[in-house]
Swiss-Prot record:
Organism: Pseudomonas syringae pv. tomato (strain ATCC BAA-871 / DC3000)
Official protein name in the record: Thiosulfate sulfurtransferase GlpE
Function text: Transferase that catalyzes the transfer of sulfur from thiosulfate to thiophilic acceptors such as cyanide or dithiols. May function in a CysM-independent thiosulfate assimilation pathway by catalyzing the conversion of thiosulfate to sulfite, which can then be used for L-cysteine biosynthesis.
Residue ranges of every copy of the Rhodanese domain listed in the record: 16-104
GO cellular component terms given for this protein: cytoplasm
Keyword Cytoplasm: yes
Family per record: Belongs to the GlpE family.
Active site: 64
């Protein structure tokens, strides 16, 4: 894959169930308040370590607030060598309305 794919929350949930890595690019306070279980917070401070330790061929799902910033982050990650990258349309807000029981705090 040379570009990322935009997907709905339902497809992101299916990928998550299959072992995809989920990263959340919202600010730290929003992530602490509520996020997708097992997702990792990714920001300018953690991205270098994340890339260095990642399996570049494992599916990677990127989520933000509403599905806009995640597209830029997904494109960047494709440029860093990730081969199977997805951006969640509607972001965390759409995820939360689709799967209200599939959120975590802390």
């Amino acid at each position: 894959m040379t570009e990322f794919k935009r997907i709905p929350p339902e497809q992101a949930q299916a990928l998550r169930a299959q072992g995809a890595v989920l990263v959340d690019v919202r600010d730290a306070q929003a992530f602490q308040s509520n996020h997708i279980p097992d997702s990792q917070h990714l920001d300018n401070h953690s991205i270098a370590d994340f890339i260095a330790n990642a399996d570049l061929d494992k599916p990677l799902v990127v989520v933000c607030y509403h599905g806009n910033s995640s597209q830029s982050a997904a494109a960047y990650l494709v440029g860093q060598g990730f081969s199977d990258v997805y951006s969640v349309d509607g972001g965390f807000e759409r995820w939360r309305s689709t799967f209200p029981e599939e959120t975590a705090q802390g």
